[in-house]
Amino acid sequence: MVFLTTRLWLRNRLTDRYWRVQEVLKHAQHFRGRKNRCYRLAVRAVTRAFVKCTKARRLKKRNLRTLWINRITAASQEHGLKYPAFIVNLIKCQVELNRKVLVDLAIYEPKTFKSLAALAKRRQQEGFAAALGDGKEPEGIFSRVVQYH
């Protein structure tokens, strides 16, 4: 059996404590000050870094979603639509693109995004026309205004 380094040769002879310390110091290698040399300080710093790393993974998702919404808002306002109306009308048109894809389209393929905005705007206009109707009351419905003769 050939050992290429003294560390590997020592591993068979020393206790596990040495390797636990080395594992912590390996994670603390890039820290400044005594935190990368003193085990006691390194344990605290590494634990704190791991906790922050875990919390940051959730924050990253939240921040990216906010960024995507801001970018879609800006892109849809260029075409005369507000963000909620744009998203709702795309859903009504059964366009199932998520926010990340919509942002990529807005940045890298503006003509495609323009056609999606036109589709959403057309759907919005159809909704307004259906809500207004033709202005006549249907037969058999009493209105609130009662006319006396």
UniProtKB/Swiss-Prot annotation:
Q: Mind telling me which InterPro entries this protein's record contains?
A: Ribosomal_bL20, Ribosomal_protein_bL20_C
Q: Which SUPFAM superfamilies match?
A: Ribosomal protein L20
Which is a Pfam family this sequence falls into? Ribosomal_L20
Record bears the keyword Transferase: no
Task: Please provide the Gene Ontology terms (biological process) for this protein.
Answer: mitochondrial translation; translation
Respond yes or no to whether keyword Ribonucleoprotein is given for this record. Answer: yes
MF GO annotations: rRNA binding; structural constituent of ribosome
Q: What residues span the transit peptide?
A: 1-9
CDD domains named in the record: Ribosomal_L20
Q: Which key words are in the record?
A: Mitochondrion, Ribonucleoprotein, Ribosomal protein, Transit peptide
Provide the protein's localization.
Mitochondrion
GO annotation, cellular component aspect: mitochondrial inner membrane; mitochondrial large ribosomal subunit; mitochondrial ribosome; mitochondrion
Domain of life (superkingdom): Eukaryota
* Similarity section: Belongs to the bacterial ribosomal protein bL20 family.
What is said about its interaction partners and assembly?
Answer: Component of the mitochondrial ribosome large subunit (39S) which comprises a 16S rRNA and about 50 distinct proteins. Interacts with OXA1L.
For this entry, the protein name equals Large ribosomal subunit protein bL20m
Organism, per UniProt? Answer: Mus musculus (Mouse)
**Name of the encoding gene:** Mrpl20
